[in-house]
Amino acid sequence: MVMKMLREIVESFEDLVVIDKPVKKELELTKFLLKYKDKPVLFKDVEGWEVAGNLWSSRERIAKFLNTDNKGLLELLYEAMEKPKPFSVVEKAEFLKNREKVNLLELPIPKYYPKDGGPYLTSAMVIAKKEFVNVSFHRMMVLDEERAVIRLVPRHLYSMWKDSVEHGEELEVRIVLGNPVHLLLAGATSVAYGVSELEIASAISLKAFGRPLEVINLDGIPTPVDSEFVFKAKITDEVADEGPFVDITGTYDIVRKQPIVIFEEMYHVDDPIFHALLPGGYEHYMLMGLPKEPQIYASVKKVVPKVHGVRLTEGGCMWLHAVVSITKQHEGDGKNAILAAFAGHPSLKRVVVVDEDVNIYDDREVEWAIATRFQPDRDLVIIPNARGSSLDPSGKDGLTAKWGIDATKPLDKKKEFEKASLDF
């Protein structure tokens, strides 16, 4: 299968909304992304650039692109995270055709909301190489023509940067933007230190398209060839204020001192499309939440052998609320599944466990299961003062109360809870 660049992918979407009129990158672009929140949008003129947003704002669109369905998507991601595959190193890349000095202020980097600290790169991924290759999403707030401040949560890239700083060095990185969804999903996974997200992306690509992920060696760092923009950059030991910024819950994150990135050189394909990822939008939900579903699945599967599906819900920002479908074999399986789900995704605040006859992708069916199969005095699990998500504004000092709803049928009364159905 021939590799598709972003333009071909975008123009293949049947529900694509095209905005032909000029649009400003500060706030105006956001209005269109909010208006068409679940549809892909292509802006033909954002201060001279083409910009696309809401590209992966639905589970079905992602699944279709990866040649699968909702259930298959979970299995695909789970398998890729369990069994990463080597990527392929090639000699050519379309982005090498154009090499320029960086001026971040001239790029269509949006300021999404009025209280944002500045224009934000939101869809960019950072690639760093030490003893292994790490790929991860990091928001970056533009400071001037060549500098931005990067949010580094204490995970793998932070560890690499910290090691460089302690040795009196800057961390050399490649920043990529405008990539297909298999790389975006891989970049949002949380895997063990030493596992390369490029190999997870390659496993997804092999399963979905029959070919591995292709990269080019760009001065020592593997860089995906299907990138619209590539930046050579360095993360320094200097810091600056980062934020405010609207995170996945739609609320503003706090201002912190974070490292400064210096952008040294820019590459891009001919007529590139800039990917604008709306903070707190459906696309943000999908790309951040979908890679957590296999982790919940793996955790629940350790205590309940038959797990049929996991869904982080849009109403819970695909971060705080989940639904899990199981086949109950013993009384207590529902509660064990609840506890395992919380262990699989520690940011989770609420989980509903249902039987396999309930469609977890239909909120009405899930609520029906709660209404007809759940009794609060018997089936509710509450865990007070647990470590939760820092993104939950109702929590305090990282602590939250978690609650689980066991909406499964009692094994000794299955017939009394049978759903009426008719084949036609």
Curated annotation (Swiss-Prot):
Catalytic residues in the record: D247
Gene Ontology cellular component annotations, sorted alphabetically: cytoplasm
Group of enzyme by EC: lyase
EC number(s) recorded for this UniProt protein: 4.1.1.126
Protein name: Anhydromevalonate phosphate decarboxylase
Family, as annotated: Belongs to the UbiD family.
Pathway in which this enzyme or protein is active: Isoprenoid biosynthesis; isopentenyl diphosphate biosynthesis via mevalonate pathway
Classification via SUPFAM superfamilies: FMN-binding split barrel, UbiD C-terminal domain-like
The protein's role, per its UniProt record: Catalyzes the conversion of trans-anhydromevalonate 5-phosphate (tAHMP) into isopentenyl phosphate. Involved in the archaeal mevalonate (MVA) pathway, which provides fundamental precursors for isoprenoid biosynthesis, such as isopentenyl diphosphate (IPP) and dimethylallyl diphosphate (DMAPP).
Reactions it catalyzes: (2E)-3-methyl-5-phosphooxypent-2-enoate + H(+) = isopentenyl phosphate + CO2
Lineage: Archaea, Methanobacteriati, Methanobacteriota, Thermococci, Thermococcales
Cofactor(s) demanded: prenylated FMN; Mn(2+)
InterPro entries for the chain: UbiD (IPR002830), UbiD-like_C (IPR049381), UbiD-like_N (IPR049383), UbiD_Rift_dom (IPR048304)
UniProt-annotated binding residues for Mn(2+): N134, E197
Any one biological process term the GO annotation gives: isoprenoid biosynthetic process
Annotated source species: Pyrococcus horikoshii (strain ATCC 700860 / DSM 12428 / JCM 9974 / NBRC 100139 / OT-3)
MF terms (GO), sorted A to Z: carboxy-lyase activity; metal ion binding
Transmembrane residue ranges: none
Organism domain of life: Archaea
Pfam families reported in the protein's UniProt record: UbiD, UbiD_C, UbiD_N
Key words of the record: Decarboxylase, Flavoprotein, FMN, Isoprene biosynthesis, Lyase, Manganese, Metal-binding
